[in-house]
Amino acid sequence: MGMSSLKLLKFVLFFFNLIFWFCGCCILGLGIYLLIHSKFGVLFHNLPSLTLGNVLVIVGSVIMVVAFLGCMGSIKENKCLLMSFFVLLLIILLAEVTLAILLFVYEQKLKEYVAEGLTESIQRYNSDNSTKAAWDSIQSFLQCCGVNGTSDWTSGPPASCPKGSAVKGCYIQAKQWFHSNFLYIGITTICVCVIQVLGMSFALTLNCQIDKTSQVLGL
């Protein structure tokens, strides 16, 4: 009974982490794609490296490393690797909770920073090709104009702005897009946390099962 339970846990944890690893590869690939094709980072000169592409590259790389530890720990029945996998998942989970709390506490300051960064970047529209490309992409995608409206463009709105008198600013449109997709973002976040907790549970259970099997076999 002990050996069959051990084998079952091994393969469950292995395939769990294999899927986890492939997800990490996809996230890493998407991050690299955004780094190559996206210019949104130039809109914020204070934190030019804090872009979605960079974040996805870091997240994808971390997921791949953690999943690799989980795969190797389960197949090799290595308690050290399993506990490393458990600790890393716990650290990631705590970091996510901390980030969520910080975003909630400093939500207003974050909004002000984003609005100020976008307003400053408008002044570089005609002098910086990267900034111009980023603004054109945002305005075309969100069907918006400027930060708060067409009045932000002192020399007249660019061609990427949609035509019409009731055009909204990109800051408002971005907030509306986030609010309209909040349910999907929340469900995705909860699913990620549940997967992490399951991974930690599998790792601890397998670790305990290895101990029990070793005692039965007299190892």
Curated annotation (Swiss-Prot):
GO terms for molecular function: identical protein binding; protein-membrane adaptor activity. It is found in: Cell membrane; Cell junction; Membrane; Synapse. GO terms for cellular component: cell-cell junction; immunological synapse; plasma membrane; synapse. It is a multi-pass membrane protein. Gene3D superfamilies: Tetraspanin. The chain crosses the membrane at residues 12-32, 55-69, 81-106, 182-206. The keyword Transmembrane helix applies. Residues 33-54, 107-181 are extracellular. GO terms for biological process: positive regulation of myoblast fusion; receptor clustering. Its main location: membrane. Keywords: Cell junction, Cell membrane, Glycoprotein, Membrane, Synapse, Transmembrane, Transmembrane helix. Glycans are attached at residues 129, 148. Belongs to the tetraspanin (TM4SF) family. Structural component of specialized membrane microdomains known as tetraspanin-enriched microdomains (TERMs), which act as platforms for receptor clustering and signaling. Participates thereby in diverse biological functions such as cell signal transduction, adhesion, migration and protein trafficking. Plays a role in the activation of monocytes and B-cells. Acts as an essential regulator of B-cell development by promoting interleukin-7 receptor/IL7R signaling. Also promotes, in B-cells, the BCR signaling by recruiting PKC to the plasma membrane in order to phosphorylate its substrates. Interacts with SCIMP. Interacts with CD45/PTPRC. Interacts with IL7R. Interacts with RBL2 and PPP2CA. This is Leukocyte surface antigen CD53. It comes from Bos taurus.
